[in-house]
Amino acid sequence: MAIKVIVNGKEEEIEKGITILEFLKNKNIRPEVVTVELNEKIIDRKDYSTTVINEGDKIEFVFFMGGGNFEN
């Protein structure tokens, strides 16, 4: 069974009962490079495997980028 959630402002259908960690794996996103906000609350990375996504939840991904060159 699928549920509807909002991911980065867009409606998506996902499998009912999955955790944040499972959702990230399904999207091929490495947990160590993203911060997840669930219903306007930042979720601690250690809780990704136990936090279940529910119908109507709002999920935001914030990715960390590296690289570049800074000169004075």
Where in this protein do the model-derived segments appear?
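Loop/turn positions that initiate beta-strands
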Residues: 56-59
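Compact, glycine-rich, soluble single-domain proteins
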Residues: 6-7, 13-43, 47-48, 64
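Short structural boundary motif marking the start of a folded domain
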Residues: 1-5
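Short, Lys/Arg- and Gly-enriched loop/turn segments at beta-strand edges
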Residues: 66-72
